């Protein structure tokens, strides 16, 4: 995801502007991506992962309760919904926000440059913003691997606060560069939410882990709603970022209150 915006700009579109691109120019590239995904999927389906003792029911054993009876899991699924949703909202639409402002006469610079040319291909600043957003998430995940001594509730709460503040700052200043920082703060969210959602679920853990994946649908719905909001606003993206703020605030709520275990399986 870090290199994908540059890949699309330079390899798929060849540095052309959006107005110059037509569907025939991207068919071969995306067919190639489909082949890669198919190969990776085949490899993953043939991998045998070890079972972790105590995380699922014994063979033939029937679970007495529904996983939905655990409130911290149910709210965790919603947390994943908002997390994946706001993550994709920023990653997918920050470039459209920047392009809108550029078309209105705004100029964005990167170390004094209004574009970045590599190998004769002009990589626009909006694509660079998306790359830096995903890159910040990558760096954050590398750093967060050394934060095991900090409780996941604390990591999640701090990250949600700063992500919300950065997004509000982008709205107030009408500046997409502030959204780039959100990627760094998003880096710890998946692991923190997942850890909190399956806490003390014992033999329900395996089923709960699969249940949590329902929440990833937020990655398709929230960006869609944001795009519809932008269309309703006449193509203006500025105020649509409140969708991201709402998502960050729910994640903060989950970190502080929603993740508390009211009923445990162990």
What do these predicted ranges mean?
Residues 150-193:
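C-terminal transmembrane helical hairpin of 12-TM major facilitator-type secondary transporters
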Residues 12, 137-152, 230:
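Helix-to-loop junctions at the C-terminal end of transmembrane segments
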Residues 187-205:
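Intracellular juxtamembrane helix-capping segments at the cytosolic ends
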Residues 18, 46-65:
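Flexible cytoplasmic inter-helical loops of multi-pass small-molecule transporters
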Residues 1-48:
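Helix-loop-helix hairpin linking two adjacent transmembrane segments in secondary transporters
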Residues 4-9, 13, 66-131:
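Extracytoplasmic gate region of multi-pass secondary transporters
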Residues 39-46, 242-266:
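Multi-pass alpha-helical transporter architecture, strongest
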Residues 1-13, 209-223:
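Glycine-rich segments within core transmembrane alpha-helices of 12-TM secondary carriers
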């Amino acid at each position: 995801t870090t290199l994908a915006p540059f890949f699309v700009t330079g390899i798929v579109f060849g540095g052309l502007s959006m107005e110059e691109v037509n569907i025939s120019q991207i068919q071969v590239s995306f067919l190639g991506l489909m082949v890669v995904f198919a190969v990776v999927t085949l490899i993953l389906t043939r991998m045998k992962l070890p079972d972790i003792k105590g995380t699922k029911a014994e063979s033939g054993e029937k679970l007495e309760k529904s996983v939905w009876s655990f409130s911290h899991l149910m709210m965790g699924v919603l947390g994943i919904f908002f997390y994946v949703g706001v993550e994709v909202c920023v990653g997918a639409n920050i470039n459209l926000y920047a392009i809108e402002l550029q078309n209105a006469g705004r100029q964005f610079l990167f170390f004094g440059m209004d574009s970045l040319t590599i190998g004769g291909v002009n990589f626009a600043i909006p694509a660079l913003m998306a790359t830096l957003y995903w890159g910040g998430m990558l760096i954050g995940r590398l750093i967060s691997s050394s934060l095991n001594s900090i409780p996941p509730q604390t990591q999640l709460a701090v990250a949600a606060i700063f992500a919300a503040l950065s997004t509000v700052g982008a709205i107030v200043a009408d500046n997409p560069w502030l959204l780039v920082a959100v990627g760094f703060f998003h880096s710890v969210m998946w692991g923190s939410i997942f850890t909190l959602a399956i806490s003390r679920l014992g033999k329900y853990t395996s089923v709960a882990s699969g249940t949590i994946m329902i929440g990833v649908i937020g990655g398709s719905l929230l960006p869609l709603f944001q795009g519809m909001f932008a269309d309703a606003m006449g193509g203006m993206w500025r105020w649509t970022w409140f969708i991201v703020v709402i998502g960050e605030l729910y994640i903060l709520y989950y970190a502080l209150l929603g993740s508390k275990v009211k009923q445990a399986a162990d």
